[in-house]
Design a protein with these regions (language model features):
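Acidic/glycine-rich C-terminal interaction modules and beta/coil loop segments
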Residues: 4-13, 17, 24-129
Length: 129
């Protein structure tokens, strides 16, 4: 249910080519990183992969994979999930791993939700030192 946030790292300098879409448009905003600590997004994102996400102004305006924090039993918990905004303002929260249930957050259930950014890439980390 939870994903590890080895804290959200500060913005990183990156080669422009790394985050350019198929139309040649660079991802706007600052790029930040964290490490995936759970299996809820398998097979799309593997545990321990480095996730790069772009500042989205704290809002989910279109479907995608987002990094967000919510209070769980009074403590902040970081989630990396597929989020689909609905016309009524609710958010459908989806794990790609079918062992996890999809759930909906109504507008009144989103007050403790802080959206950190939209995931733009994940990368396998192999350390050599």
């Amino acid at each position: 249910m939870h994903n590890l946030l080895n804290p959200i790292n500060k913005p990183v300098a990156y080669p422009r080519e790394l985050f350019v879409d198929e139309k040649g448009k660079c991802t706007p905003g600052e790029i930040m990183t964290c490490q995936m600590g759970g299996d809820s997004m398998q097979p799309t994102i593997q545990p321990c992969e480095l996730i790069a996400f772009a500042d989205c102004g704290g809002k989910v305006s279109e479907p995608g994979i987002y990094v967000f924090t919510r209070d769980v039993f009074g403590r902040p918990c970081v989630f990396v999930k597929r989020v689909e905004p609905m016309p009524d303002g609710s958010l459908v929260i989806i794990s790609d791993n079918h062992h996890y249930e999809t759930f909906t957050l109504d507008v009144d259930e989103q007050s403790d939700m802080q959206v950190h950014g939209r995931v733009i890439a994940s990368m396998t980390m192999r350390r050599f030192v």
